[in-house]
Amino acid sequence: MTGQPSSVHGICGNFFYTPETGEEVMMNDPKYMRAPTIFEKFYNSGSKIALVTAKDKLRTLLGNGLSFDDERAICFSAEKSDQATKDLNGIDNVNDWLGMPVPEVYSEGLSEFVMAAGVKLLEEFKPNIMYLSTTDYIQHKYAPGNETANKFYAMFDKYIGLLNKENVSIIITADHGMKPKSKEDGSPNAIFLQDYLDKKFEPNMAKVILPITDPYVVHHGSLGSFATIYLEDKSKVDSVVNAIKEIKDIEVVLTKDEGCSTYNLPPDRMGDIICMSSEFMTIGSSEDKHNLSGLNEPLRSHGGLHEREVPFISNLKLQNLDTSKQLYNYDAFYYAINGAL
């Protein structure tokens, strides 16, 4: 959205903690953004912008800085498509316009709604810049090669083909990968780090925060492979780091400064310690705080080093690709625009 890492734009997860107030809050409010979006900059230069997201939690971030009173911007979610208005989204009566009802949030249909809307917007609204954000529900539930997963990608491929017919530059990428994180019996494979630290030290000496946390618990039950730990007593950092290193299947344990400089994270939105689990393991806080009732399939999740690699697919031959530099998903618009020139 910004062409920059989270150390610049400030959004470093779904969820973060403010030690000053003791609040744990979702990062879906534009006030947490520290950089303008590419969409805002193009809009201000006179371009037409179309943004469609599956989950409504992203909509206000995507549409930040846009105005919807001059018919140059459209921004809505599939999840709340029936609530879109001209004043707030640049479009109304979305479901009638698209000929599709509001999809179930935990379904393939949520992403198909986004893709179908993208095709129709490209044909009718003709934006200069368009961003389509699907949901990872299917990827959380079904491994590659599964019949349901194959059906999803056949649907996705169909719409990419329709978009490609419109003589546009397309980049397909992802925010993260996905790995199986369950035991042989199908139950989640998790280290409940808050419980561990409460027993190892005094209770509540440490505060474990999981940035993957969001309201969509059916996806992953807030179990991912990344955690950050806040300590009231900063003199205990080394002893807590050493204690976490003793845990089998925790493969990265870094201080705040080490972790933020290594992974381009904003230090003031990270705890005193950053850790990541191994490939097939997740990190939880306290076992009794996780709602796992929606995990009807074996857990698949993300957040660690093993889910960093993502696809980066262009429908055009990329010009001036600098192979000496690491390519990131936030480079998508640079190369999409490069391909359009």
Q: Where are the predicted features?
A:
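Short secondary-structure boundary/capping segments
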Residues: 65-68, 145-148, 185-191, 289-292
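His/Asp/Glu-rich, glycine-adjacent segments
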Residues: 2-143, 225, 236-239, 245-252, ...
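Short catalytic/ligand-binding loop motif for oxyanion handling, primarily in non-cytosolic enzymes
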Residues: 57-63, 138-142, 179-182, 187, ...
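Metal-dependent active-site segment of extracytoplasmic phospho-/sulfohydrolases and closely related
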Residues: 151-195, 275
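Acidic/histidine-rich catalytic neighborhood
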Residues: 177-228
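Structural motif
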Residues: 129-133, 171, 274, 313
